């Protein structure tokens, strides 16, 4: 799935789109996606000017965006102006190695369970085959009031 199709399944837009490509997706199961990290990212001038490191919360956000694509594809729907897909929580988040400009994040997310409209996922972010972050995440689709 290229960026044009990804934008059909994410409500996010620049500078907050954190998924560049989907390598594989199995409905109701898992997604493998890519975030190419470049020196041009808007957060690097402030995090940190002399030693740029991708903020860990944005790595988890990239995992959550991959999860959103998986969920919308699984539901057979797309984001719209009547509902919002909220990031509802995270557990067991671990950052194991820093992510730097030039790295390619491989985002692996699997559906753990869906209960009463709450989706639970397990996610891993890898660089060069090594896990750099992992998290359990929860999301929920809610109507806009």
UniProtKB/Swiss-Prot annotation:
Pfam families to which the protein is assigned, alphabetical: FabA (PF07977)
Enzyme Commission number(s) of this protein: 4.2.1.59
Active site as annotated: 47
Catalytic activity: a (3R)-hydroxyacyl-[ACP] = a (2E)-enoyl-[ACP] + H2O
Keyword Lipid metabolism carried by entry: yes
Annotated GO CC locations: cytoplasm; membrane
Entry keyword set: Cytoplasm, Lipid A biosynthesis, Lipid biosynthesis, Lipid metabolism, Lyase
One GO MF term: (3R)-hydroxyacyl-[acyl-carrier-protein] dehydratase activity
Subcellular location: Cytoplasm
The protein's enzyme class: lyase
Function (record text): Involved in unsaturated fatty acids biosynthesis. Catalyzes the dehydration of short chain beta-hydroxyacyl-ACPs and long chain saturated and unsaturated beta-hydroxyacyl-ACPs.
HAMAP family in the record: FabZ
Entry similarity comment: Belongs to the thioester dehydratase family. FabZ subfamily.
Protein name: 3-hydroxyacyl-[acyl-carrier-protein] dehydratase FabZ
